[in-house]
Amino acid sequence: MGSTETRHPPAMFDWFFEAGCPNSLEEDPPILRQFPPDFQEQEAMQMVPRFCFPFDIEREPPSPAVQHFTFALTDLVGNRRFGFCRLRAGARSCLCILSHFPWFEVFYKILNNVGDLLAQNQVAEAEELLQNLQQHPLLGPRFSGRSEMDSSITVRSECGILPPALGNSKLLSCFVAPDAASLPSIPENRNLTELVVAVTDENIVGLFAALLAERRVLLTASKLSTLTACVHASCALLYPMRWEHVLIPTLPPHLLDYCCAPMPYLIGVHGSLAERVREKALEDVVVLNADSNTLETPFDDVQALPPDVVSLLRLRLRKVALSPGEGVSRLFLKVQALLFGGYRDALVCIPGQPVTFSEEAFLAQKPGAPLQAFHKKAVHLQLFKQFIESRLEKLNAGEGFSDQFEQEIIACRGASSGTLRSYQLWVDSLKKGSDALLHSMKTKTQPAVRNMYRSGDSLQEYCASKAKSGLKGMQNLLTIKDGDSGLQRGGSLRTPSLTSRSDRLQQRLPISQHFGQNRPLRPSRRLKTEEGPSEPLRERSPTLSPGDTQNPWAEDTLDGSFLGSGEELDLLSEILDSLNVETKSGDLQRASQSLDCCQRGAASESCSSLPDIPVGLPWQLEEDKRSQDPQPWSLPGDLSLLQDTPFSEVVSYSKNSCSQPFQQSPPSQGDPGPSLSKLDPRPSQSPCPKLLRVPTRHSPPESPQLLVSTEPNSDAVQRLQSISSPSCSHSAENPRNQPPQVLLGQACVQPLEELGAPTYVSHVSTQQRPQDKQPRVADLKKCFEN
């Protein structure tokens, strides 16, 4: 316990007494009984009883349980005597034993036995027990006059009943003194057990660092046993060092001014007196509250310790705190060996002279920068100086020592010279390297991060502009795609189109104003003549074979509602396109798609493939009801080419009659044809050309049909122009102004003839009018486009 008892104390204890509880704090506790009866130390008799009630008796309610606590008395030389107290239930009285030996468990058990005897009014038996203990010789391995462990001595006491001696019927008690060479263990050592239970590991480390720095430490608790146990256990953690300053485990109320002392101290204050202590001017005081488990310190004592030592304490203290054995004591002993184990290298041994300690040699050691900085402070500590003096005293007296501390130094040096030392060096180098690496990373990344932060706005604007341009590009592509799909209007039916049926029907409607509806202009379909002559029609749109009818792109279906919807087909534009194409390439002919659509629309719930037919078909119109004389006419062109050109056709049948619109053939390439200077403003009474019906024979759809060669007649062009002129636009015979139902009623389809069967076509009338030859086809088309 750090006491400096007399070399050979005369007895196991000096004084035993029982003090009564005073009525107020100003009164001294009365002594009810004592042993030995002739004890004459007046100073002790006046001062010691007041330590038996270290709490506010006026405010603190009496405890229903028995409490054990300890106080210490230090003389001018530094010798200490310990008072072991047992406070009875209800705090009516207190039993106390004053001794130089810090044997906590032994004296606590003695007090319990004496208390039980006194409670049974066996005063004689209690006095006999105390007399036997006082007269018992102290010589022996377990009863030494001075403890080598000092404050960290472990008391392993056993109380048993011995068999009665011969001729004596009384039972004797047996107490076993502690082993001076052992370390405190859990749960045998009550003080250490109370400390690890009441205080957390981190606060234990902070308390240990504050004691090594010799701070003013103040502990508070509402339980006396816990308060004194924490004070004594914290001192025991300093082994082999010894607390050389003021030590008061329980401060009585009349000594509260000691808390304001300027020197280092370790004082325990009961919870009932803590408020009065805090009212005093306390400066630079470390306060540990065991009840709330909090540590208040104005210093960084833990950071002053070497980092590897602190890491060792925090890591291993959690594992050994509540485990039985010497784990906690062994851990703190190892820490002390790491901190002060180098003192042996600073001992100077000169033959014939006493052994001395060289402070310069101790500081000249290079165990590491943190430990070297700690050594510079440690050489000025009173506990380190007292430790060195005690070691030198034994060496110069010729007494060897081989305690637990020296054994731990040897163990640590063996480890530090090998793996532990290399590990410490590696940790130091790693920390230095990591610091340099972090510094270099910061210096390199900070400019980049700053530039990235600054360019954040510009990057956002750049991304926004890119997104806008991408959206505009997609819109342009969609617009171009829509335009391309619109340009397919009026083209070959074999052109693959992904548009829906309604879109295709909408594209085939004429671009003109009908019934108050406005439609956009039809896109231009001019052919580039400067690039060269057009390719032959038979190469561009070959004849469909029966197997091609299965191709989904080779057929185009139309709803029956298309013909009955009231809309009209743009026959005039397609006729003009045919005239324009034939004007540039007179040897080629193609079928009109609108006429094909009319033929396809006549079919009920059937889909037919309409190929581009390279030759003209024998379309004939019914005779007009108002005109009884038919005007037959033929399609001009290269007859030899028409005879050599094969073709195929899909015929659609309706319920009542099948109508086939006629196909016009423009004049040959060499003959530009007559032109009109202006449109004919005549009313619709002008006759319109009609095709005569020719009787034919039915043949399979697969059989080709050949046209009979006819002579070209210039009247055909005239009559075609008269059809396209506005003079016929309002006539009933004009198919452009007639609904699809009327067209179907007026038209009749001619079935295909068998292979080799002749077909007769009547000649067209050769009547011509001079005023119809003035405008040209190109001018007429340009007029319609405008």
UniProtKB/Swiss-Prot annotation:
Subunit structure: Exhibits low nucleotide-independent RAB35-binding activity. Interacts with clathrin heavy chain/CLTC and with AP2A2, but not with AP2B1.
Gene name of the record: Dennd1c
Biased composition annotated in UniProt, kind: Low complexity: 657-675
Protein name: DENN domain-containing protein 1C
Keyword Phosphoprotein: yes
dDENN domain: residues covered: 320-398
Bias kind Polar residues: ranges: 542-552, 706-740
Motif (Clathrin box): 570-579
Main localization of the protein described in the UniProt heading: cytoplasm
Species whose genome carries this gene: Mus musculus
Pfam families for this protein: dDENN, DENN, uDENN
